[in-house]
Amino acid sequence: MLFRSEDEVEAIHLASLKVLQDHGIDFLEPDARALFPKDGVKITDARVRFDPEFVTETIKTAPSEFTLHARNPEHSLRIGGNWMAFGSVASPPNFVELDGTRHAGTRQNFQDLLKLTQMFNIIHFVAGYPVEPVDLHSSIRHLETTYDMLTMTDKALHCYSLGRQRNQDVLELTRIARQVSNEQIDNEPSVFTIINSSSPLRLDIPMLQGIMEFSKRGQLVIITPFTLAGAMAPVTLAGALSLQNAEALSGIVFSQLVRPGAPVAYGGFTSNVDMQSGAPAFGTPEYMRTAMAGGQLARRYGVPYRSSNVCAANALDAQAAYESVFSLWGAIQGGVNFLMHGAGWMEGGLHASLPKLDRKSTRLNSSHANISYAVFCLKK
C-alpha cells in the first residue's frame, strides 16, 4: 500500500541523509569505528558523520531476499520480497495465566509458551524469550533458554545481543543443533538478532558487537530504532520517521562494512507517547501510519522490513483488540516481511498473555488467509 507519496518518501530519505551528514551517529565501540574507511565518513571522538554518497553506495550490497534456516528445513523461512513471517511474543518480564493471575516470568512459563509457539503453525519463528525467565541467573540465562528453544522447537530463533561472548555461545549452540560445520552456518543464516539504537543518534557497545559478530558470520541482523515521537524523537511523524530512517541506515551501512552481502533488515518501531505521562503508546493511528511508511522506506532501499504487533492495553479487552488490529494491519499494509510479537504481547510489553497468544494466533490465521486470497486474485 502506498501511504506516503514518492515525493514524501524521498523527502524523508534526504532529511535522513542530512542528519547523518550534519549530525552523525555515536558509535560507542572503538572496534566498530576502526572498521570505517578514511573516505566517506568523518569521525570525531565517538561521532561518525556519513557522506550521502557513501551511504547510498554501501547499502547496495545488502540482499533483498534470503533464507533463514531452521533446525527443521520445513520451517526455514524466505525473508524479503512478498514473503511474510509471523513471530511469537518476546521479552516481557511478567506472565498472565489463563485465570488472570499476573506474576514474574519463570522458566516453566517460558517453556509453556515455547510449546505453544511450536504448536501453532501460523507462528513461524521464535521471536525471543516469550517471557523473561527471571528465575534463571542472568549469567547462564542465554545458555539455558537457547537450549530450550533448540530442543522444544524446530523453528528459526532469535539471539539477544548482550555481548560478544553470548552471541558466540548462541551461534555455537545453533550450529550444534543443526549439525552443520562452521563454514556452512557462516553461509546459511540460522539465527537473527534485533539491534535497537539508543535514540537519538547512538549505537551502544552491545548492539555494535552484535552487528559485528552476526554480520561477519553471515547471520541476520535487524536494525530497529526505537523512536517515540515527543520523547526521544521529533513530535511530528515526518520528523520521527526521518530520525528512525537515519539510525536504521547507519546500522545497515555498518553491517555491510563488516561483511558486504550480509543479511540485514530494516526495522520500524516508531510510535507516539502519552503526553501527560510520557508512557509509550502502541496500536495508535500514529503507530499504524509509521508502520506503513516504514515499509515504503525499506522497499526504497531494497531490504526486508520488520514491524511488530503491539498494544498498550492492560487487560484482554476491547482496547487490546483495537490496538492489536491497528498494529497488525499497519504492518501488513506496510508490506511487513518479519512480524515480531505476533501473538501474546500486552501492556506495552510488560507482560505476556497466555489467553491473548491463543486468540491472536487465530487472528493471524485469518489475516494470512485474507492476504493469500488477495495475492491469488491479483495473480489471476
Language model: regions and residue ranges:
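Single conserved hydrophobic/aromatic residue that forms the stacking wall/gate
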Residues: L2, L364-K380
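Catalytic-core signal marking the mid-to-C-terminal active-site face
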Residues: F3-A15, H23, L28-L35, D45, ...
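Catalytic alpha/beta active-site cores
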Residues: R49-P234, A238
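Acidic, His- and aromatic-enriched active-site or binding-groove loops in soluble protein domains
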Residues: Y147-A156, S242-S250, T290, W329
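Phosphate/pyrophosphate-binding betaalpha-module
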Residues: G210, A248-P304
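Glycine-rich phosphate/pyrophosphate-binding loops
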Residues: P225, Q256-G268, P304-N309, G334-E347
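C-terminal catalytic subdomain
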Residues: Y305, A315-R363
